[in-house]
Amino acid sequence: MGLIEGVNAWLNREKQRQILQLNGEFSETRLQSILSRKIRTEKLAIKDVKLRTFITDDLHRDEMVAHVYDVTYGVVKDNIDTLVIVDDSIVRGTTLKQSILKILDRLGPKRIVIVSSAPQIRYPDCYGIDMAKMGDFIAFQAAIALHKDNGTAYMVDEVYEQCIAQDSYPKEEIRNVVKRIYEPFTEQEISDKIAELVKPKGIKAEVVVIFQNLEDLHHAIPNHTGDWYFSGNYPTPGGNKVVNRAFINYYNKVNERAY
């Protein structure tokens, strides 16, 4: 609802601007045309609350995603409308790629914009949330793909060597060297690559992914400062050990938790 309130506030300012530009010279029809503009909101995707793919085990997650949503037809203008969908976060991108985008594309939009209220989730959590494997994160997959695209895959090897070197350190001396994976790229470059990765083959609509940035997230919730899965700045030394170990597991194709 916050997004709709914000867009409506913008639209009211736009209406005011257009009316002022008329300098008092307007007809009733013209005024009505300006005032009648509104934001279209529809419940297009209806979620089955009994199904939750995020907490499903890896083996069964993929087969569940196709059964989570149903849609409403006859609302979207074919090859004209842009659909803006809001997600609280994008962790793996599994549901987007295997379910949501395929379903929404059948409605015929020209473009689908996915807006994540959370920043890019780049690092594992080790304080209670089930996000422990680097290779699962779509943001990490995007960064690795960008290294391959740009001929900088050697940096992945360098980060691995640094992780191995620190693995025997006392945890108080370990630093999060996995940050280097993301450093060469802007947030926009990673977001664009994520859009490529989550777009299923065969869909017609253009796909755009927009993430909340970390600075604005802190501005929105100043009393909640835990951001390590976005920033990599862990509040305890053990967090750095976990992220480096998670990268070692990824590099060695070891499919297990880092803690």
What are these regions, as identified by a protein language model?
Residues M1-Y259:
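PRPP-associated nucleotide enzymes
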